[in-house]
């Protein structure tokens, strides 16, 4: 592929373990790369991607579509315009049983590795809220996981053979504190039955926003008035109509035809289309 004339960009959508060698090879051949999440699995490999991109002067983008979700983009704009006041805490997660989407390589990786093995859908959007690596950075974390109550059972179902042990717990929770004293709660669970959730939540001194299980927002009367919303009781959440008003007001300024096309091509509201548009 890299030897073909006219190829400027290579998408890497393979198993996690092969992301880095493929991406590095493509950049060394003078091709920019877009790498599926997670782009790399170790700090050594992360630095290898960074070093290669800088040495070859090629773009290397991790394809994290969750940061292009309509709700996440609108809340990010609200936060940066101060509508929630000072942000103090954020949450994100990746939780739903992946069922028939299990592949042998992914199951084997989970058998061998503990911790949050798929964190970017959750941590990507909330890092943007806190301006991580812009005005703040992560300082330290505490993480724990449950036992693998379903791991061996799922391994048997996917792999067709038994295993004596399974390293990845059913639920992983990670608490991160930033240098500026903000906190992040990141969760991962693809084993137990539950509705899909990325647990997106922003907690500020003047407001609150959360996407799951249903969109919720709460604003002070002063902040709500800035966008023409009347709040009679600041102890009550906004109604659905008021939330929609906010989402429209703070929506990214894509042309209407782009938004229509994104929704037609992407059943999840267009977030993958908007992500790909960055590479056009």
Segments (PLM) and residue ranges:
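A structured beta-alpha segment of the ubiquitous adenosine-cofactor-binding alpha/beta core
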Residues: 1-8
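Beta-strand-loop-alpha-helix segment that lines the small-molecule cofactor/substrate pocket
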Residues: 8-9, 15-16, 20-68, 82
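Short, well-ordered coil/turn residues at beta-beta hairpins
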Residues: 13-14, 187, 192, 204
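Predominantly a Rossmann-like dinucleotide-binding segment in NAD(P)-dependent oxidoreductases
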Residues: 56-61, 66-166
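Active-site rim elements
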Residues: 110-116, 161-163, 188-189, 258-267, ...
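A short catalytic or substrate-binding loop motif that flags glycine-/basic-rich loops and adjacent residues
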Residues: 120, 165-170, 178-179, 193-194
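C-terminal helical cap and adjacent loop that interface with cofactors, partners, or active-site loops
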Residues: 127, 195-204, 210-213, 219-280
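Active-site beta-strand termini and strand-to-loop segments that position acidic
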Residues: 174-180, 202-204
